[in-house]
């Protein structure tokens, strides 16, 4: 997951124009069609890409904190229980 976030982060950091940003958002929505359909409007795709980025960042941050504290990473089960990885 870290490499996925780093790739997305690098793409965003290399943006120089709004067009570059929209190209990245289109790329994310095409490669992550499990999140949003391509027929969605541009504002909806922008929102979905932002949500994806936020969720990845939170997951990676949690994994780093767990590792620094010597605690195994946790996976949230659908029933609300955590399991060690």
UniProtKB/Swiss-Prot annotation:
Give me the gene this protein comes from: U62
* Family designation: Belongs to the herpesviridae UL91 family.
Question: What taxonomic lineage is listed for the species of origin?
Answer: Viruses, Duplodnaviria, Heunggongvirae, Peploviricota, Herviviricetes
**Organism in which the protein naturally occurs:** Human herpesvirus 6A (strain Uganda-1102)
InterPro entries linked: U62/UL91
Q: Which domain of life is it from?
A: Viruses
Its protein name is Protein U62
